[in-house]
Amino acid sequence: MKILRKNHPLLKIVNHSFIDLPTPSNISSWWNFGSLLGVCLIIQILTGLFLAMHYTSDTTTAFSSVAHICRDVNYGWLIRYLHANGASMFFICLFIHVGRGIYYGSYVLSETWNIGIILFLTTMATAFVGYVLPWGQMSFWGATVITNLLSAVPYIGSTLVEWIWGGFSVDKATLTRFFAFHFILPFIITAFALVHLLFLHETGSNNPSGLNSDSDKIPFHPYYTIKDLLGIFLLLMALMILALFFPDVLGDPDNFTPANPLNTPAHIKPEWYFLFAYAILRSIPNKLGGVLALILSILILAAFPLLNTSKQHGLIFRPVTQAIYWTFIANLLVLTWIGGQPVEYPFTTIGQIASITYFTIIIILMPVSNTIENNIIKL
């Protein structure tokens, strides 16, 4: 068997990626989230496949087909709630994975980091089009508001919106194409994830100390396979608790009402994992400015390798930047809270302050703290 996995053309790839892969001996549990994201992706594809067998992407039957899945299909309610809450678990793992990358300076592996940003954007697109499919009130109005943002594009905005809608409003054509996108995008994510792994294994993994670990590596199996299995078990346990005991806690009550173009909900908001970006969008009074800020809130991640001037790798020995990093995390939580609040005082003011702080920390404070710490080392 050992000879086979080392010489077989296909098994050799698996062997070099998951069995004999030289891995730093000191990587902590924060490195588990990559494998957890892979598990989340598999769960989402499998549950989504079974949901797609019973779902109909027609405006007249979409809402009732989801109700039919929950009521009449064997374990349909479980599949539906695993899929809906699986998306939340996916984004929790994703945010922690990106946060770990920033904290431990993994962004210096620029190819892996940039593919990761593409993966992040693709996952957000998949979640957005998926949220439209149940065709509830928040699905419909969320789709209307977010797609309508494209009308801010100069000259071609209105044409672009109608082209995406497939008509003059969010309707049957929009739902059908969003279902098609939601079906194909996870497979594109899978392809990008493999490229992400390919680039990671070219350079080798980063580690908590930020030092070169070539002299101290161990095989991935059995050490990290066992460690990953523990993480997977905890993830599945959290997902099952969420899906079985609190299935609707992260959803919106408005989505229990079928979509009605004549009745606007009091407060339109996306799923919780988009609220930080939504708060940044709303904090700018100008429509085009808001859209640009929304896009930049994610694309600014690409600036980390460019703005990094530190002589040390990661934040483990850098107390000044550590304080700024945790302020950044707290600020993100504030943005998430504000995104779910109505557009009125004092929430608008808090949102504007938090949005300015978000960009200031990344563009100004972190590079300045890098310079300060570099000078402290020289003393």
Swiss-Prot record:
Q: Cofactor note from UniProt?
A: Binds 2 heme b groups non-covalently.
How does this protein lie in the membrane? Multi-pass membrane protein
Concerning InterPro entries, the annotation shows: Cyt_b/b6_C (IPR005798), Cyt_b/b6_C_sf (IPR036150), Cyt_b/b6_N (IPR005797), Cytb/b6-like_sf (IPR027387), Cytochrome_b (IPR030689), Cytochrome_b_C_euk/bac (IPR048260), Cytochrome_b_N_euk/bac (IPR048259), Di-haem_cyt_TM (IPR016174)
Q: What does this protein do?
A: Component of the ubiquinol-cytochrome c reductase complex (complex III or cytochrome b-c1 complex) that is part of the mitochondrial respiratory chain. The b-c1 complex mediates electron transfer from ubiquinol to cytochrome c. Contributes to the generation of a proton gradient across the mitochondrial membrane that is then used for ATP synthesis.
Cofactor (UniProt): heme b
Q: Where does heme b b566 bind?
A: H97, H196
Q: Which GO terms describe its molecular function?
A: metal ion binding; ubiquinol-cytochrome-c reductase activity
* UniProt miscellaneous comment: Heme 1 (or BL or b562) is low-potential and absorbs at about 562 nm, and heme 2 (or BH or b566) is high-potential and absorbs at about 566 nm.
Membrane-crossing residues?
33-53, 77-98, 113-133, 178-198, 226-246, 288-308, 320-340, 347-367
| Principal location listed in the UniProt entry | mitochondrion
Q: Which organism is it from?
A: Akodon budini
| Name of encoding gene | MT-CYB
Report the sequence similarity comment from the record.
Belongs to the cytochrome b family.
Quote the record's binding site residues for heme b b562: H83, H182
Q: What is this protein called?
A: Cytochrome b
